[in-house]
Amino acid sequence: MRQRILVVDDDASLAEMLTIVLRGEGFDTAVIGDGTQALTAVRELRPDLVLLDLMLPGMNGIDVCRVLRADSGVPIVMLTAKTDTVDVVLGLESGADDYIMKPFKPKELVARVRARLRRNDDEPAEMLSIADVDIDVPAHKVTRNGEHISLTPLEFDLLVALARKPRQVFTRDVLLEQVWGYRHPADTRLVNVHVQRLRAKVEKDPENPTVVLTVRGVGYKAGPP
């Protein structure tokens, strides 16, 4: 079954280029040029991933992202101009999984999309734990004392990466490669913002974390079991 990408961008020429590239890679695509309409499109089309421009008529991309993330774990990749560095952080804090700067190479875009869609439906049984948090890997389920903790797919992948190697301290660059699929140096703000988002969900007290620990000057590691 072909995976569906929803392109949300009011630049008609860019949206057409994205459609051509993505369809050439085997994806189905739909295009929306308005932020408010994008919310309806996500509910009706149930896309596997959303490519979301920051600057949109109707509702800007940051607000769209925030509303989507309130009730959906659909992967969101922001499209942004190089001058929008402040908005990039706001977008990540609002729930975006990744971002790509315009102008970009089609191969780079496709690689980012595939990285976010990469799932393994045949994962062997694997149960992990960090502190008092339990992780059922093949079921993509996280619980504390039997109560479900809702995570986005990327937040789940980040937690699993840490849990699988509890003695390892992960640099941000290593996490960018293992979780986001980057093969070159990239913006480590991606990691910092997602760790904050993950802590807000899995920690009893995010200001005093026991699940995802910071190793000052190095990176992050899993808390003790």
UniProtKB/Swiss-Prot annotation:
Feature: DNA-binding region: 125-224
PROSITE patterns the record matches: OMPR_PHOB, RESPONSE_REGULATORY
Molecular function terms, GO-annotated: phosphorelay response regulator activity; transcription cis-regulatory region binding
Chain ranges of the Response regulatory domain: 4-117
PTM annotation: Phosphorylated by MtrB.
GO biological process terms, semicolon-separated: positive regulation of DNA-templated transcription
Gene3D superfamilies recorded: 3.40.50.2300, 6.10.250.690, Winged helix-like DNA-binding domain superfamily/Winged helix DNA-binding domain
4-aspartylphosphate: modified positions: 53
InterPro entries: CheY-like_superfamily, MtrA_REC, MtrAB_MtrA, OmpR/PhoB-type_DNA-bd, Sig_transdc_resp-reg_receiver, WalR-like, WH-like_DNA-bd_sf
SUPFAM superfamilies assigned: CheY-like
UniProt keyword annotation of Flavoprotein present: no
GO cellular component terms, semicolon-separated: cytosol; protein-DNA complex
Role: Member of the two-component regulatory system MtrA/MtrB.
PANTHER family: DNA-BINDING DUAL MASTER TRANSCRIPTIONAL REGULATOR RPAA, REGULATOR OF RPOS
NCBIfam families: MtrAB_MtrA
Listed name of the protein: DNA-binding response regulator MtrA
